[in-house]
From Swiss-Prot:
SUPFAM superfamilies: P-loop containing nucleoside triphosphate hydrolases. SMART domains: AAA. This is RuvB-like helicase 2. Pfam families: TIP49, TIP49_C.
Amino acid sequence: MSANTISTKVQSKDLNGLSLIAAHSHISGLGLDDNLQPKESGQGMVGQLKARKAAGVILKMIQAGKIAGRAVLVAGPPSTGKTAIAMGLSQNLGSEVPFTAIAGSEIFSLELSKTESLTQAFRKSIGIKIKEETEMIEGEVVEIQIDRSITGGHKQGKLTIKTTDMETIYELGNKMIEGLTKEKVLAGDVISIDKASGKITKLGKSFTRARDYDAMGPETKFVQCPEGELQKRKEVVHTVSLHEIDVINSRQQGFLALFSGDTGEIRSEVRDQINTKVAEWKEEGKAEIVPGVLFIDEVHMLDIECFSFINRALEDDFAPIVIMATNRGISKTRGTNYKSPHGLPMDLLDRSIIIHTAPYNADEIRTILLIRATEEEVELTGDALALLTKIGQETSLRYASNLISVSQQIALKRRSNSVDLPDIKRSYMLFLDSDRSVQYLEEFSTQFIDDSGNVTFGTNDASVKQTKGAANGEDKMETD
């Protein structure tokens, strides 16, 4: 008898993470050295040396924290790295300095007025460091005794905790027992307990218990047993924005509005009271004001009322540094009939310092495309990269970078791990750039519906033209 062989097939499926590849996910800073000199290529930034050096000076102003209420305009043609400079600036600032990024069209809403949307954006960009002294219990756990009731009542227990100088036994309530169980605290752990909130933080295991375990995970951390008194006073710094304080004090549901997003209109009286209180905290040394950055992309989409509000807001005591980006030349300011540089009123331009960006050359485009391919985990051959660089020069950098992921899918279809020249050519023929799309529209313009509603169906001898009647709104058909 022949034994039947049993074969098993194991399928594994990779889980997609939350960190998706975005347009500027490869940027980790401005690419400057300690002397604010820009590197040719660094931290994901390529070229634009003058603009990056100017942004580095702005970075030092922000980090000093003494200058606020300044306006910076980043102007340049499309696809020259204006938003990338702002993203690099935010990466260099870190999490301590508030950075708010909005688009010019975001402030137009049916629920909020334009000035309220701008005010909230300004207030989000101002941070407040509030200093608070709290009592902490810090020591090494010697023993935990938990008594569970047979009838299912409240648990009771005792916690023996020590430092190098003293040892104390604490009575535990139901809440503290649940906290210790949740943190999986055992004898030999060094813990910290906030007396005000009852929050338990596990700092690590004591060095004296290092030999009690034969095997330990990589996350296991050994620390020294604390010295001195068990109860200590520590200064804790909380960083919040002015907008968060506004929301908490303006609505009945308080901080829950921060999660729902339903902040609504906040009265000016509430903001005035908060400003007065924050000024008092600053004088008493309880709080420190951190001027942040408000980045407004496509700033030419704002109208004259918004620009007037920004002019006034920049003179306020609580004003961040406002960085604006635009790709417009001499164009109309929205809400007016006159033209101005970059679509901004002259009084706001006069208050701004302007950073210009220039188009990339071939070498810079090649380096940027190589960085994007590395970020998207796409392997490009030399010929494919050369063709992509040429496409980026003749069309736009965005179009060339978009072809990378498309070409990868075409390469995978022919079971290849690297993107070659035919893959780039095929994706170039499948997906049009803006210039070829305009040529297509001009060639078949009669077959598209125009502003008057006219369209021609068919070609050559037999064609039907449909027009919209101006007088009674009826459709009319004409046959050639």
